[in-house]
Amino acid sequence: TARKVEALIRRMPRGTFEFTDYIEDDVVTDIPIRLKVAMTVGDGHIHLDYTGSDVQVGSALNVPTGGRAHPFMAIALFNYFITKDPGIPLNAGVLRPIRMTLPVGSVVNPQFPAACGVRYATVLRIYDAVLGALARALPAEIPAASAGQGCMVALALPDLEATDDDLWLQRTPPTRGLDNPFARARHALSQIAVTARGFLA
């Protein structure tokens, strides 16, 4: 897998391509959250540098990466690779040629006790930022970043047959949704069991 990804990267133009995107606010304040990425394409590897992204925030929008290369920070690259070569297996090898700089104390590498329960809303905007950098590197293939989806669609339902206070939270992933007539609901939704005491799974 890594060799296939490296071969695709070698076909990309060399250089550093930057893009900055924003989340409108962090819910606690009305100050936008900046997400900045510099994508450097080298010989068979890509470096994503998130230096310049804002410091961790007081709301649950922080993305806990532990400072290591994390799949959440490169989803746009994964989608590009599997679009160019649909035969690439989706495993850890896809991430191996990708290096990352994730500044300590930033929204992309927060420190304890940072809240992070709504991190996927930030991940969606990170996707847009990396897509924007790709658009600058490959304007003939990637026309632009998306219009920006910074929210998750969730539906909470009580379990009427449960004997306790269990609740089912259904989250629609960004790759597929309920508007797809060919997708069955069980594929279109992720189920996460939660209770009033916190997340179970």
Task: Name each region found by the language model.
Residues 1-201:
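Glycine/proline-enriched, intrinsically flexible loops and inter-domain linkers
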